[in-house]
Amino acid sequence: IKRDVENAKAAPSGASAGAATQPDGLILPQVLDDRVYAPDSYELVPLDGMRKTVAKRLTTSFMQVPHFPLNIDLELDHLLASRAAINAAAREGVKVSVNDMLIKAAAMALMDEPDCNASYTDKGIAYHKHANVSVAVAIEGGLITPVVFSAETKGLAEISEEMKDLATRARERKLKPQEYSGGTFSISNLGMFGIKSFASIINPPE
């Protein structure tokens, strides 16, 4: 205890040793405590710019934005039957996914419920005129959310083709900044891993 007190006295005021205080008030560790983890007991992999940005933005969001997850069970028999019929009649090369249908459904719902398609600001509530749906895409070393802009105006085939293009270029790290910013609502899917439900973190300023 005496050693801890002496170390605390020697540490800079306002932050503990081995930690950095960010402009937004977050205290992030710069190094692991050698008294807990020996330096040769782990391998340190530096973060790239994207991971640093994602970590900071989502940590801030989780701390500052009220989160209240809601869950409901849905019967998707009709949706799956409709998807099969749509794909059977679609032109060659078009294959609509469940995700594509969820993008369209979310966009239509957002236009019907403007309060869900809004962003809070200090000057007031910004009600967005279009449903710009972000879709989480896993890429090497992180996650990115390309946007289907004005999704309420697009058909399923157009959404499907656009989403395939965005996801491909996202994995190749060829997206332009304007293609993964400006969303008003996000969709993240973990169903392929057997996940039935999860509480996601709001992607600000959505």
Residue ranges and their predicted role:
Residues 1-206:
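C-terminal catalytic/motor cores of large multi-domain enzyme assemblies
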